[in-house]
């Protein structure tokens, strides 16, 4: 992503690998670079930055977070829903995480639109690396060699 231009759209990610994967996917799919990626350094910092960002609607019009499920995708989801509920800015009643990620519109149009993706696929425990593995064809020669070395 072009981090020299400041856009009103922000994506919070855990680490540099997340930034590189998102940037590569955008480039590969020829998506417009109209958002900035902020590397937060850890899942805790992503959550902290998310809490701060949704309290100030003037800063970002759209806020995305991409965070690893690690061992508990449901727990991670509930953590994020709790933040949204406590903000009072979103209708969280019966809110579920769709397999293709969440886009949540605010109750007041002055507040930010929220996007959530829980790695690897909004459904399973795991992380960025598991997501990337899903992108590789099982017929890939290098992947087969890597699997053989396990």
What are these regions (language model features)?
Residues 75-150:
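Activity-critical C-terminal alpha-helical subdomain
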Residues 1-71:
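Acidic, glycine-rich catalytic loops of TOPRIM or P-loop NTPase phosphate-binding modules used
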